[in-house]
Amino acid sequence: MKVVAVGGGTGLSTLLKGLKNIDSFEITAVVSVTDEGGSSGKLRKELNVPPPGDVRNNIVALAKDEDLLAKLMSYRFSEGSFKGHSLGNLIIAALTKIEGSFSEAIRILERVLAIKGRVLPVSEDHARLVARFEDGEEVIGETNIVRKGGKIVEVRLDRPIDALPEVLEAIERADIIIFGPGSLYTSIITNVLVNGVKDAIKKSKAKKIYVCNLMTQPGETTGYRVSDHVKELERYLEQSVDFVLVNTRKPSEEVLERYRKEGSDFVEIDAENIQNTILAEPFLVEIVDPSDGQRKIRHDSVKLADVIERISRW
């Protein structure tokens, strides 16, 4: 069973941690390349390499010895000239320079870490995300888009870039294509904007699944319900998804209040506005982030994988 997961960031890596435990799944993760924040943004600007952070997260998620590797690859320097950089990002950047290819650097790391599946950047070319807001202003760059806030009317890339042939082949041959979880515009739709991706998805006979976010994202999806997420994704795909996975469990009031202070809120399910097949489950789990001790919410990777495995048998 060939499974392609499209996205970037924490959401996609959470999904992959569950999918890798299903023996029948051959996994390909397709990762966005428009990230401009943090360590990835600095390396992209200073070394002229594609942003390695999302790729690193997803390689670690698919690794067999995840606990040990996560500590090594995710180690972030807190002082000196490397402050803010993770070791994994530096390794990927160095391999890219040595091999002259971002994709080859990833392949080497995949072999070294013995991951289940593969991780592909959607493209090796450079592009920035551009958003046009309801007030008419256009903002360039993911970080600036989120900082601007307001209702996004349209997103595009600042220049045309081509998808890797391996990405298009994986999509066209897939039995299942999963979108998300992850930032709607900056992690998911940004992949669809790359030349060839949308057409490959249209050609594919795969079952198409959207995993909706648990919370809205300030500056990106403020006030969005489940149907708003689905409609926006389908607008850029120019086709419907077959299944929508939504969470039914609300966070504790303490956690919810902290998210609200950051401009984020629980994504409400408005099933009456959704034509797709909805699978509603208590996907939410609360975790303690070891980096800051804060209680945060994530998708339950095991439950997600179980539901997707069930869909694969329908």
UniProtKB/Swiss-Prot annotation:
Keywords: Cytoplasm. SUPFAM superfamilies: CofD-like. InterPro entries: CofD, CofD-like_dom_sf, Gluconeogen_factor. It comes from the Bacteria. Pfam families: CofD. It is found in: Cytoplasm. GO terms for biological process: regulation of cell shape. GO terms for molecular function: LPPG:FO 2-phospho-L-lactate transferase activity. GO terms for cellular component: cytoplasm. Gene3D superfamilies: CofD-like domains (3.40.50.10680). Its main location: cytoplasm. Required for morphogenesis under gluconeogenic growth conditions. Belongs to the gluconeogenesis factor family. This is Putative gluconeogenesis factor. The lineage of its organism: Bacteria, Thermotogati, Thermotogota, Thermotogae, Thermotogales.
